[in-house]
Amino acid sequence: MMKLEMVCTGEEVLSGQIVDTNAAWFASTMMEHGIEIQRRVTVGDRLEDLIAVFQERSLHADVILVNGGLGPTSDDMSAEAMAKAKGESLVENREWRQHLEDWFTRNNREMPVSNLKQAMLPESAVMVDNPVGTACGFRVKLNRAWLFFTPGVPFELKHMVKEQFIPFIREEFGLDAKVALKKLLTIGHGESSLADKIEPLELPEGITIGYRSSMPHIEIKIFARGEKAIALLPRVTGHIKMVLGTAVVAEDKATLAEEIHAKLLNSGLTLSVAESCTGGMITSQLVDFPGSSSYLQHGLVTYSNESKVRVLGVNPATLDDHGAVSIPTVEEMAKGARAILDSDFALATSGIAGPDGGTEEKPVGTVAIALATRSGVYSQMIKLPRRSRDLVRSLSAAVAYDMLRRELLTEAVIVDYQSIGRFSK
């Protein structure tokens, strides 16, 4: 079996100043291709440390993906460290120098002299193209390992891994591509309760289950390795969905927002949103996807009572009698948001995200959510105690999305979640 490792570079990564999302993405992507990373090492911007890691890990791994350190500044040392680790000099790659000059010309910019550093590669390096940036990728054989150098910019890394790295390792190591994966997205259920339902199932040979918690979602990954297992994957997936019931909210989607976007895009249906405690989160998550303007008409953050009255038309008496966090108020918010542009649907949220502001009657984590349609309004008030402010908001957004999703599927809009309580109306 091929031994794959990863070396992440950069003082800001090592010190925790930035979260290494590149490493998480790479590991997840490799797993989806049936390839497991054996080890990951993080190294700061010190030449001697980089040299030592390259020399030591190349004795054990077959392939090492090195991320970062290919920029034009003095702390970008990956190419120099690789050359010294192999006892080579850096030489100018004329093809990449031309690429740099062309790139700056196309962007109507004068190329700084410092960028020429990005064309300097170890003598034995094989250039790896990067059509979306200025950092030149390359690979070098040291001891038993191929070291594959990639840019730290996430977009550039992802492009290089998909277009260059994966085809390289498949060809170099003759890896079997007979691997398939299904992902089930769940909300409102703990990982242990999901596992309690799935683990008793007898899975066919070649099929395994994995879990990934990324609140407010928990993702269930169903891996199939080999032709027989791949053929059985749809049946196994269907069985697991049946066992989990309403916990499953999407298939092969990273978030519920992505699922809603997929359902509304090109549907001809429209959506408006009025948010209080979620503070624009619902709207923002949808706007992340290209094409959302085809269905998303407006997103309003009506945080104060005055804005609820003046913008959404909430009756002041409703606020006086029931408070901002209540079923009557959130229903009027949803109706008002829908009426502004005659949308097909409108979502509204109003709650107490904390850490302060709760009462005995309405403690922190109390959130009212409503969905207005052309035929009526659905609403519920959920309980999210002992959660952080961020988690209260993200779970509330997820429940709102799920109400809309279920309405689009003509299913019961309000359902029970194992880990989310609900007030009776």
Curated annotation (Swiss-Prot):
Disulfide bonds: none annotated. CDD domains: cinA. InterPro entries: CinA (IPR050101), CinA-like_C (IPR036653), CinA_C (IPR008136), Competence-induced_CinA (IPR008135), MoaB/Mog-like_dom_sf (IPR036425), MoaB/Mog_dom (IPR001453). It comes from the Bacteria. NCBIfam families: cinA_nterm (TIGR00200), molyb_syn (TIGR00177), PncC_domain (TIGR00199). Belongs to the CinA family. PANTHER family: NICOTINAMIDE-NUCLEOTIDE AMIDOHYDROLASE PNCC, NMN AMIDOHYDROLASE-LIKE PROTEIN YFAY. This is CinA-like protein.
